[in-house]
Amino acid sequence: MSGTILENLSGRKLSILVGSLLLCQVLCFLLGGLYAPVPAGHTNVLGSLCRENHARQNDTSFFLYSRGEGSCTQVTREEVEQDSMKLANQIVHVFQMPLPRDSRVLDYSRWQQNLIGVLQVEFGYDSSSELREPPKELQLTIDMRLAYRNKGDPDHAWKLYAHGVEHRYLDCVAAHIGSSETLYTCDMIPLFELGALHHSFYLLNLRFPLDTPKQMNLQFGHMHDLTLTAIHQNGGFTHVWLMLKTLLFPFVVGIMVWFWRRVHLLQRSPALLEYMLLYLGGALTFLNLPLEYLSLTIEMPYMLLLSDIRQGIFYAMLLSFWLVFAGEHMLIQDSSNKSTIRSRYWKHLSAVVVGCISLFVFDISERGVQLRNPFYSIWTTPLGAKVAMSFILLAGVSAAVYFLFLCYMISKVFKNIGDKRTSLPSMSQARRLHYEGLIYRFKFLMLATLLCAALTVTGFIMGQMAEGQWKWNDDVEIQLTSAFLTGVYGMWNIYIFALLILYAPSHKQWPTMHHSDETTQSNENIVASAASEEIEFSNLPSDSNPSEISSLTSFTRKVAFE
């Protein structure tokens, strides 16, 4: 058989290919580092106090807003302090987004993709109160109304986006103890999450109803400042991200078609590794598909969930591929039968599948529900927060364990090849030079695989922590840089692109000759290959299994059986 392109490509051509791919990798890092802004931005919005309109208090089509024609009657902090009841049930906390800048009205762009809101709460107790420390897991009931309007709409033309009465649990500490009151500040609480940023302006009305019969919000003194942190994806980063996807998508599709065409030209059924390469390329193509362009014209609140599903499919396929890739090159089998998922890898891949399904269930339990209720969050209850944190920690530990196991498998591959290499001195010079060249190329590819796996696992763990840092209580700050994101994304494409090229079947046709003449000619070709990088590796005559895709595999298995 003719083997793979990795085996038959000349040293100079292989160097040009590897150099070109490394240059593309550097460009991906520079694209994010020099041209893209940080992936996400945030704005802190201090809530305005508006006096409640009791006649329309239960009308969900009525909204109070602080800027523009027809704005609400605002209440000062002094008026609240002077009232004996602190204006209970008479105040609405209003957040109008985005904030103006330099007297210019700003609006959200659909390029910003999504919007997440978290709330910082401060409240006070009279110093005469016996309560000095608020109870832990303090339950707060909030009437939330989220509205929107678009550019060109009148200032009062707010339309309801979502409404709900939700519970949040606070963990607070005393920030200032004064002679008249004690001020408490609380950890940030998740408020809402929008999977699509389709409209120009958003308005949030928050009410904290006091109800004695229902024991609602009676444990609080009175509200002080409320600060909403609105987090969104930066539009400039989305431009760069979609440009990268648009450029990479046709290249991956083209190389997949080319690869599978070469496989089907062979007079054998595709090997397991060839099937896995095709599935991996398909998962990458699905990830590369720039569906985000549709969100610029169509409101797609499920885009965040869809992005998580696409990335989850890719992670599952990539992790599975690495196990099969390393396993196929460990080259230790009890028989020379063709490898299958069921016969060799079902235990390894079952663990990957179970882990990915668990993460999918966790994701759908939050973002799936948010399609109907954007105020829902699994982090809002103490039990839910512990479960969510446990999932994040478990995902990080599992990723680290997977990487260590992959390192173990690759170390066994190197050990096995080292053991088989002891048989090289007994071979002819031509055959020894041939296999030494193949082993060198193979080791380089395995080290590149290990580097790709390390960056992937690091990116996964940092991504999980960055997503949860606004929702947990620890003071942990994780910032994924644009250069890291575009670099890792480009690395996935370049790595899989290289594998599809290097593991594609080589269709070089070698002349048919008698055994003695064939061996002489083969020796001459290989010695010439060692002397000149222009001459390509040629296959040594062997009785290798026609199902093998690599003569290195054939060599090591042959030695193993002997």
Curated annotation (Swiss-Prot):
Return any one Pfam family short name: WLS_GOLD
Q: Which GO terms describe its biological process?
A: imaginal disc-derived wing margin morphogenesis; intracellular protein transport; positive regulation of protein secretion; positive regulation of Wnt protein secretion; positive regulation of Wnt signaling pathway; regulation of intracellular protein transport; segment polarity determination; Wnt protein secretion
| Source species, domain of life | Eukaryota
Q: Does the keyword Transferase apply?
A: no
Mostly located where? membrane
- Known glycosylation sites: 58
**Residue ranges crossing the lipid bilayer per the database entry:** 14-34, 240-260, 271-291, 312-332, 345-365, 387-407, 442-462, 483-503
Q: Which GO terms describe its molecular function?
A: Wnt-protein binding
**Family statement drawn from the similarity comment of this UniProt entry:** Belongs to the wntless family.
Summary of the function given for this chain in its UniProt record: A segment polarity gene required for wingless (wg)-dependent patterning processes, acting in both wg-sending cells and wg-target cells. In non-neuronal cells wls directs wg secretion. The wls traffic loop encompasses the Golgi, the cell surface, an endocytic compartment and a retrograde route leading back to the Golgi, and involves clathrin-mediated endocytosis and the retromer complex (a conserved protein complex consisting of Vps35 and Vps26). In neuronal cells (the larval motorneuron NMJ), the wg signal moves across the synapse via the release of wls-containing exosome-like vesicles.
Identification of the protein by name: Protein wntless
